[in-house]
Amino acid sequence: ITGIGIIAPNGKNKRQFWDNCIKGLSFIEEEPEMRSIGLKSSVLCRIKNFNLKDHVKENEYLGLIELDNFVQYGVVAGEQAIKDACLDPLNLNYAKKTGIIFSSAIGGTPTIVKIFDELTSNGKTDIQHKKIGERFYNSGMFNYPAMLLAEKYGFCGPCSSVSTGCTAGLDALGIAYK
């Protein structure tokens, strides 16, 4: 493991994340809506005050602003990891051996649910066949952030996405270590 990037409720980079963990700060908040949809829990942690333009250049990833937040978070965390690893984007000698292990607990599920609700009148009708936009597929694919980064930097090593719920980040570290 040579580089780590993090976008999380308790930090938008490795240092901020770790400092907030050490301080024991909680970013849990009540969300009554969770109970109304049948969940036993009513708490969650949100990533707040994230602005993609603060992290990537405007033309660096075309269309990224239109994709699900998880894709944006993944690309920004990936860029952080590449910087953390001190990889020189102009030196492609390492590209054949460099891989990406990416993780997300739920990926683009919010976008998938939103589109499903739109196509079924919130689950009350059969799916209506109509255009949903060209960005839908990429917003829902767990591997899309890793693919964007591998393509941009020419990485040819393993490119994998892990989606194992709350342990996805730890699982990605374990897989990368192996």
Feature map (PLM): residue ranges:
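Short, hydrophobic/aromatic alpha-helical segments in well-folded domains
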Residues: 172-176
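Conserved "HGTGT" condensation-loop signature of ketosynthase/thiolase-family condensing enzymes
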Residues: 1-158, 178
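Short catalytic-loop micro-motif centered on adjacent basic/acidic residues
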Residues: 159-163
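Short conserved active-site loop signatures built around small residues
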Residues: 169
